[in-house]
Amino acid sequence: MEKADIESIPIKKTFDLKDEKDAYDAAEEMVRIGFYKEKKGFKILMPKESKKTAKRIGYIVTTTVTSSLRKEKQERDIKYWTYHHDKEHYGIVLVSSKVVEELGF
């Protein structure tokens, strides 16, 4: 999927994360808000200044979302894409695979 396609996905909330603790909090909030109530996804912005930190944030977000959905007995069929958002940020967009299909991506 191209960056333009990724950025055309409707976003419910954008999280600008600075560190690992922010990643855990954002993942828990995404699960609380829910992936299936609206035809929208979530966007995570991570700093490019430290590639190692960005990788850890991305890993924490994706694994915490999956494990939290399992704990809440919700469907875990989530798609995500990582991309270069801008000069200062990497981005991840997370969205339900059903929403991706309904939106025609």
Regions of interest found by a model, annotated:
Residues 36-99, 103:
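Acidic, low-complexity, intrinsically disordered interaction modules
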Residues 1-55, 98, 103-105:
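Positively charged, hydrophobic/aromatic-enriched amphipathic segments
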